[in-house]
């Protein structure tokens, strides 16, 4: 990548400070990746005494790839040149197909645009030059990103076999859409690997860059943008020492080193920014292809193994079928602390998991639900204050209100939680045995890191169960106002959850 970096600095308006270098990263586990470094000896001769930040990189908008690039293509006359005419024709065809409308967003259009440029670059009829073509050929197409959706990695079969519940279905579906579209437009050619490479490279490198809404307003919006050289800066929340912003005068994108916490004893350090303030590990694996290390609280949005759910029965009810009928996604959040792991029991999604195990009938031999005659829904069995049982068709929100909504339902919640913990303990035994038999192809792969992280989490939960230590966040820290629980959304569904959650 050294040659690509030099070309970009010589042939685009991108500027780099004298104290900044770009070379192979020193981050643990970052095999073959690149990073940005700052030389503090040189920095001290360049910065002002009262400066709180220092400019390391400046990237004008003309040296980026965003929706602006695509709008320019669509606005140009097809008579200007053959390349423009071809790309515009293919883009217009993609946008015109109603089956594609659900997939049209800025990031996906950038992917389509670059896939088309890459295909035309292979065609000797067209001669593609300029910054975007160089960046595509020398950076994006030469970067292998092992996202779970990348079917051209050596662990692709293992992702499908052991982690199908974590495969991002919208990603998979969009890649399939592109493959079908390109196959129809370029008959007899197979571009599946190229499409996968471009998609994974773009997804992992694209940044949300602020843009002004106009000259007469202070409002901003964010636009997905590929920013050369800035995309070499790695993520580390524990060692973050830089951030990027826009220069309001020029609209350039600027990487700033933060000078407040500079260690005067070191000569050089790697530059780090934050990709996300809270690290949700499934998101990082799906988008960036790695798991960050941190001493801060991290989150794993854990999805139960469908093989276990589909064969396990609780009081005669198939767990997988129940959650499907109730439109419950069988996932929960594991909060990873330095010395323990806890389950986030403060979110609605966790309450939805508990519905099946409700003990409000006060009889462990009785189940709170009854399968309908059509086999596609469950009726809830309720008991009034006189002990009379009635059967009602309730959705998951109504079940939460009926079972756990009142103050006098605390006893039921505690009994229900006990049942869930018993279920979870059995699950951990099943899952641990299943994944322990995996024959790892590489000790340094993204798949291996993900597998090892799950092993560690399951072992931690099992150890806490066996030593009678609390595994629920609220039960342990709910009354401690100093400890804040991180808030993160669940990642997009796998195809299993997508099918189950469809109305």
UniProtKB/Swiss-Prot annotation:
Domain SET: 52-276
EC number, UniProt record: 2.1.1.59
Protein name as catalogued: Cytochrome c lysine N-methyltransferase 1
UniProt family annotation: Belongs to the class V-like SAM-binding methyltransferase superfamily.
Record's catalysed reaction(s): L-lysyl-[cytochrome c] + S-adenosyl-L-methionine = N(6)-methyl-L-lysyl-[cytochrome c] + S-adenosyl-L-homocysteine + H(+)
Encoding gene per record: CTM1
EC category: transferase
Stored InterPro entries: Ctm1, SET_dom, SET_dom_sf
UniProt entry keywords in alphabetical sequence: Cytoplasm, Methyltransferase, S-adenosyl-L-methionine, Transferase
GO cellular component terms, A-Z: cytosol
Region annotation SET-like: where it falls in the sequence: 190-291
Localization: Cytoplasm, Cytosol
Gene Ontology terms, MF aspect: [cytochrome c]-lysine N-methyltransferase activity
Function: Methyltransferase which mediates trimethylation of cytochrome c (CYC1).
Entry domain remark: The SET-like region, although related with the SET domain is not detected by any prediction method.
Single Gene Ontology BP annotation: methylation
Residue runs in coiled coils: none
Top-rank taxon: Eukaryota
């Amino acid at each position: 990548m050294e040659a690509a970096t030099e070309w970009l600095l010589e042939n685009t308006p991108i500027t780099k400070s004298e104290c900044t270098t770009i070379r192979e990263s020193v981050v643990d586990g970052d095999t073959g990746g690149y990073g940005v470094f700052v030389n503090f000896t040189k920095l001290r001769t360049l910065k002002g005494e009262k400066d709180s930040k220092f400019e390391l990189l400046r990237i004008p908008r003309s040296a980026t790839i965003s929706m602006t690039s695509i709008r320019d293509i669509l606005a140009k006359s097809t008579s200007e040149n053959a390349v423009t005419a071809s790309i515009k024709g293919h883009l217009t065809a993609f946008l015109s197909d109603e089956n594609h409308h659900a997939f049209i967003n800025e990031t996906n259009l950038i992917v389509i645009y670059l896939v088309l440029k890459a295909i035309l670059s292979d065609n000797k009829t067209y001669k593609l030059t300029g910054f975007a073509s160089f960046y595509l050929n020398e950076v994006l197409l030469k970067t292998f990103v092992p996202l779970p959706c990348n079917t051209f990695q050596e662990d692709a079969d293992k992702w499908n076999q052991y982690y199908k519940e974590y495969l991002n279905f919208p990603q998979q579906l969009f890649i399939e859409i592109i493959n079908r579209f390109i196959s129809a437009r370029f008959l007899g050619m197979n571009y599946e690997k190229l499409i996968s490479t471009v998609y994974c490279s773009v997804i992992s490198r694209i940044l949300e860059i602020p843009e002004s809404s106009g000259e007469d307003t202070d409002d901003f919006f964010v636009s997905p943008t590929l920013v050369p050289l800035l995309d070499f800066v790695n993520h580390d929340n524990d060692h973050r020492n830089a951030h990027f912003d826009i220069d309001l005068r020029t609209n350039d994108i600027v990487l700033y080193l933060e000078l407040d916490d500079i260690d005067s004893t070191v000569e050089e350090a790697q530059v780090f920014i934050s990709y996300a303030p809270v690290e949700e590990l499934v998101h990082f694996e799906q988008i960036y292809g790695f798991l960050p290390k941190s001493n801060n609280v991290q989150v794993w949005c854990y999805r139960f193994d469908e093989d276990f759910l589909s064969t396990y029965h609780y009081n005669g009810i198939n767990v997988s079928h129940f959650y499907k009928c109730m439109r419950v996604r069988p996932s929960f959040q594991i909060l990873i602390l330095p010395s323990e792991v806890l389950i986030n029991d403060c979110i609605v999604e966790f309450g939805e998991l508990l519905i099946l195990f409700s003990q409000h009938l006060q009889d462990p031999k009785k189940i709170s639900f009854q399968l309908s005659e059509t086999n596609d829904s469950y009726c809830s069995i309720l008991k009034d204050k006189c002990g009379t049982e009635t059967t009602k068709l309730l959705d998951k929100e109504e079940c939460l209100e009926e079972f756990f909504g009142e103050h006098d339902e605390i006893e039921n919640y505690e009994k229900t939680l006990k049942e869930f913990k018993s279920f979870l303990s059995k699950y951990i035994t099943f899952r641990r045995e299943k994944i322990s038999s995996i024959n790892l192809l590489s000790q340094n792969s993204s798949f291996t890191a993900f597998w090892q992280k799950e092993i560690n989490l399951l072992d931690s939960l099992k150890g806490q169960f066996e030593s009678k230590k609390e595994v629920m966040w609220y039960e342990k820290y709910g009354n401690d106002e100093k400890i804040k629980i991180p808030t993160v959304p669940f990642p997009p569904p796998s195809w299993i959850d997508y099918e189950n959650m469809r109305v």
